[in-house]
């Protein structure tokens, strides 16, 4: 498998180079040259595979021989070594709980897969270095925001040099508002040949999130920045552009622009589908369309799901549930893609004014706006509705949503109610014969076949102020993170300016 840059000005690379460098030299995101296509027979076999075996089958084409099968099987098994239950909330809306990993957030999957891949590559390079007196040069990765999701060019090779890997230890720089840093810290903890530096805004993460960032030790360093998340992110971006730092460090990113973090997010869509089929398939092999509502900020999560569908997984319609940061919602309504400064909301992980992964969604859909409108619906949910949804669902359905899940739940209700009036619908899929790219998922709200799942991306305990105010009760701390409460945070205070950060890096 080769990967090309969506900037169209860099040479193709393999998975290893794409994972280590993060972005292409032309600042574009990497995209697989081919989307694997699973046959109907393979899809049928996927119904009964265990999670680890299924994960291996899905990820093997993307890795493309850069990791041997035995090692990839181990990486996949360790990546998904926790539950992904599909839990009913109402008759028509189910929750895919993605918070049963070590840091209680969906980002555990991508972070664990990426960390183990980089660890594998580090050992591989170390072994190669021991047998060769000449080390390879390194082309430093460069990061930049994506300014437009629309590109009609086809991938081409250029004469520019291909990024090379090196035996120099990899340094992962991460700016976080909470969940990303915790997942990356846990995923990379103890990984040989990889150091992680996390920048987080002082006083702007929850107590549990901060403990997840600051109590790891070993190869994880937490910098407590006296500023905002935007300050942290700006410093990380400037570091990737700094030639002096890149001479000393082999820098890479661990957010969803990196293919090793983005692509494994497909896995839990397959896991959800397995459970869906087991629960709803009838004797003739038919089952309701699994419409999917995803809380969306940077659009990496929903993009991974759309990749799964493009590879042949029979999924229903996708709904992007957004907060006040509604760039994509407005784009679908107006065909005008207008980025803006991020707006602060109670669903803060979705506070993104320029979603970098949307360009990948457009690539999946051949950069065609009509294709986009057929494949994706989007709604913008206010903070007031988010809070009232948490309260209402807790009271009526005895289910505790986090703010991001509440945005998704509210969007799911809107979607199901809007399709209620549509007629001549087709809401049953035959998994063996249906063209799932053209499913018209329209059914009445009270029809048991009209259903949707929401992705519950984080445990509500990570957002105690919003959730506890809404439900009027304290949230029980899960045993998996309760041990953190007895730990002492270890962080390095840092001023919110790049000069201070660079000085610390070079000392």
Please report, for each region that a protein language model flagged, where it lies by residue.
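Acidic/proline-rich low-complexity IDRs
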Residues: 156, 444-447
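Generic alpha-helical structural signal
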Residues: 145, 153, 423-434
């Amino acid at each position: 498998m080769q990967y090309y840059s969506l900037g169209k000005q860099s040479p193709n690379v393999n998975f290893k180079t794409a994972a280590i460098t993060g972005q292409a030299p032309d600042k574009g995101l990497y995209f697989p040259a081919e989307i694997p296509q699973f046959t109907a027979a393979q899809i049928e076999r996927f119904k009964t595979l265990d999670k680890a075996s299924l994960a291996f089958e899905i990820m093997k084409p993307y890795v493309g021989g850069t990791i041997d099968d035995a090692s990839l099987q181990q990486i996949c098994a360790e990546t998904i070594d926790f539950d992904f239950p599909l839990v009913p909330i109402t008759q028509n809306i189910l929750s895919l709980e993605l918070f049963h990993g070590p840091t209680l957030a969906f980002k555990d999957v991508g972070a664990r897969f990426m960390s183990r891949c980089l660890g594998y590559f580090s050992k591989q390079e170390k072994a190669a270095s021991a047998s060769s007196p000449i080390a390879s040069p390194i082309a430093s990765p460069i990061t930049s925001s994506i300014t437009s999701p629309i590109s009609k060019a086809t991938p081409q090779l250029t004469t520019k040099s291909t990024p090379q890997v090196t035996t120099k230890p990899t340094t992962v720089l991460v700016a976080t508002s909470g969940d990303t840093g915790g997942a990356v810290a846990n995923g990379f903890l103890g990984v040989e040949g990889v150091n992680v530096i996390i920048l987080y805004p002082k006083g702007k993460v929850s107590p549990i999130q901060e403990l997840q960032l600051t109590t790891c030790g070993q190869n994880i360093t937490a910098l407590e920045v006296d500023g905002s998340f935007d300050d942290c992110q700006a410093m990380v971006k400037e570091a990737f552009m700094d030639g002096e730092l890149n001479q000393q460090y082999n820098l890479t990113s661990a957010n969803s622009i990196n293919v090793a973090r983005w692509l494994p997010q497909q896995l839990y869509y397959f896991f959800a589908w397995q459970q869906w089929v087991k629960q709803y398939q009838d004797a003739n092999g038919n089952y309701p369309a699994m419409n999917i509502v995803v809380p969306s900020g940077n659009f990496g999560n929903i993009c991974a799901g759309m990749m799964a569908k493009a590879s042949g997984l029979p999924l229903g319609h996708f709904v992007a549930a957004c907060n006040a940061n509604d760039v994509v919602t407005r784009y679908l309504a107006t065909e005008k893609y207008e980025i803006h400064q991020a707006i602060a909301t109670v669903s803060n992980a979705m506070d993104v004014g320029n979603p970098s992964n949307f360009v990948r969604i457009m690539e999946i859909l051949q950069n065609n706006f009509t294709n986009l409108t057929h494949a994706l619906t989007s709604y913008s949910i206010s903070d007031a509705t988010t809070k009232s949804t948490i309260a209402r669902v807790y009271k009526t359905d005895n289910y505790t949503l986090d703010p991001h899940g509440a945005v998704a739940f509210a969007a799911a209700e809107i979607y199901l109610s809007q399709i209620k009036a549509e007629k001549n619908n087709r809401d049953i899929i035959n998994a063996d014969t249906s063209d799932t790219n053209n499913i018209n998922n329209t059914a009445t709200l009270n029809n048991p076949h009209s259903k949707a799942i929401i992705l519950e991306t984080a445990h509500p305990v990570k957002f105690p102020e919003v959730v506890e105010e809404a439900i009027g009760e304290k949230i029980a701390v899960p045993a998996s993170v309760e041990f953190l409460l007895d730990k002492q945070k270890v962080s390095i205070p840092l001023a919110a300016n790049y000069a201070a950060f660079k000085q610390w890096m070079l000392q």
